[in-house]
Amino acid sequence: SKSAAKIPAGSRIVCAEQKGSRVLICDASISDWNKEGAILWEWSPSSDTAIAPEHRKWFNCLSEVKPVKNATAILVTASGGGVALVDIKKNKASFYAFDSGNMHSACLLPDGNIVTASSDGDHICLFDIKNGCPSPESAKKKIYYLKFAHAVVWDKKRELLWAMGLDEIAAFKYAQEPEPILEKVDSIPLSGAAYD
């Protein structure tokens, strides 16, 4: 297509394929992703030996994928309640855990900890993983109320976490010591109901 011809060679698109429950990295210059060479890398929770078989259901209906760590890893969330940090080179999750259903978004904080947004639980969740996490069940986490939480993003310039809920965008200050904690410092009201 004409639009694909304008995309610079080497450009990549990272996407979640819900039907096949896969994360894909595709060549953005190829308009037909069924063509050979279009899919450059893929990950599936069902084939990742780092994810226990009984936990794979947490990754039903992948909802968001973000390249992180200078595009050496992918941060994955799923409506089934799972979050995973997948090492691209190893094609394995270096961390994964469960929070609650309808997890929509995640972001990596500057120290390597992870925040997720879940609408079923009406909250964002701070996972303390920087010092290791021996198992998904033992993941240290803190919950912060945010009605119908749908999105989280780290603002490097302002050093704030922005989180979108049903009727507000909330700003959280992040403190790493003595232990990781979020503090709500601002809120921007939204008119109507926010959704994705």
Question: Which residues make up each language-model segment?
Answer:
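Blade-loop segments of beta-propeller domains
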Residues: I39-V83, I88-S105
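Short coil/turn segments that connect the beta-strands within blades of beta-propeller domains
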Residues: G10-R12, N70-T72, D111-N113, K157-E159
